[in-house]
Amino acid sequence: MNISTLRLDSNPITTATATHRNGILGCNGTYSCRFNQFQQRKKTPSVIVCSTKPLASVVDHQGVNESGLSRIESLSQVSGVLGCQWGDEGKGKLVDILAKHFDIVARCQGGANAGHTIYNSEGKKFALHLVPSGILNEETLCVIGNGVVVHLPGLFKEIDGLEANGVSCQGRILVSDRAHLLFDFHQEIDGLREAELAKSFIGTTKRGIGPCYSSKVIRNGLRVSDLRHMDIFPQKLDLLLSDAAARFPGFKYGPDMLREEVERYKKFAERLEPFVADTVHFMNDAISQKKKILVEGGQATMLDIDFGTYPFVTSSSPSAGGICTGLGIAPRVVGDLVGVVKAYTTRVGSGPFPTEIMDKGGDLLRFAGQEFGTTTGRPRRCGWLDIVALRFCCQINGFASLNLTKLDVLSDLPEIQLGVTYRHPDGSALNSFPSDLRLLEQIKVEYEVLPGWKSDISSIRKYTDLPKAAREYVERIEELIGVPIHYIGIGPGRDALIYK
């Protein structure tokens, strides 16, 4: 398929260039030409795509006030959106809103365990797991970086679902040739591993993320680039499957499984080829051409393999450092990072949760906020906002600003608590977020109690129009962590955002 430019309604945009055996290249076989075409909005399009609905980007632009537009446009060339808690903070919505002002939105780590829920201009809900949230913005190119583990059946299912709902993906998604392939058997092993751990289970999404990263680290994993060499693909896959069978007696492997998988992946390879690219070269080329790049983090810092509540963590680095290793870009080019944090705290699965509300209050938050996992559907544990953990996340990532989400969920509460200090059993204060899980189980949390506002704030769009108690809550968080809150979510829709 050779498409040079597309036009949606009255706005010309560019999309896929000529496909090539080595990925999506520009008109002269280089990645740089790809960007030149992507930005040529005034040239006559060769293909017209008609739409009966208004452009989401136009609707969004009209919904952003002057101060909001100024906030967005002031973000650095390479910016990022990262989670500040244990995931599910609402990162996808902010990425979706910001994407219109960026040329590229990129995923750098994780896999289909990252569930991002976003809504289009008509209020239709999209649950994405691998495809970057910028896909709903027609002029945005989406990149799945080398640090992501890719389950091809899941990726194709997402693409098919988007296409069926009028969202064009062809020529708008690049998949790194260095990304590792996540197979169905990785998911099976994930379940066997949880059963093996019995009572000490980690509570994974069972999407095969950990086993796939394990294959990567012990160096017998397969990468997207291996799909270009189907002559030796069966031998590599046989080695991987044999290793899994040796490690897990419950995993049954035989010649039929290998034969079936090879046939499946021959078809997958053919379908994936137009999306494959050397994204490391692509991203650095984009940076040198001053293209604006938005990095979308999956999961969150408190699930980081190094900085999270280990071992109750994910298998990648959803912190600032994961941006560089997961995309192949230099630390010096990474600019503003926006941390996304709920106005309260949630967590899915096992692991320490110091500010968890164990009584009916937790249930009230869960149902008011519809706290059920995008990926698993599991009910999330709920608690008060943990300032100690949030300050730790801000320290690690160096956030320029924060997006406080779901402030509207707290509207019916007579009073709201903030967990401001951790104390040892003897009453002495901890100076930092501890790595010791036993200590985390023993600590006592000291709370500040603030008044609630007992009024619906979901239709408010100006910060000064918020109830005084709501503003005091926001400003107290800023005082405690020392990072400004620039975005406040007061509902799930794209327009339900206050720019502060």
Swiss-Prot record:
It is an enzyme of class 6 (ligase). Its cofactor is Mg(2+). GO terms for biological process: 'de novo' AMP biosynthetic process; IMP metabolic process. SMART domains: Adenylsucc_synt. GO terms for molecular function: adenylosuccinate synthase activity; GTP binding; magnesium ion binding. It is found in: Plastid, Chloroplast. Gene3D superfamilies: Adenylosuccinate Synthetase, subunit A, domain 1 (3.40.440.10), Adenylosuccinate Synthetase, subunit A, domain 2 (1.10.300.10), Adenylosuccinate Synthetase, subunit A, domain 3 (3.90.170.10). Keywords: Chloroplast, GTP-binding, Ligase, Magnesium, Metal-binding, Nucleotide-binding, Plastid, Purine biosynthesis. It comes from the Eukaryota. This protein may be expected to contain an N-terminal transit peptide but none has been predicted. Plays an important role in the de novo pathway and in the salvage pathway of purine nucleotide biosynthesis. Catalyzes the first committed step in the biosynthesis of AMP from IMP. This is Adenylosuccinate synthetase, chloroplastic. It comes from Solanum bulbocastanum (Wild potato).
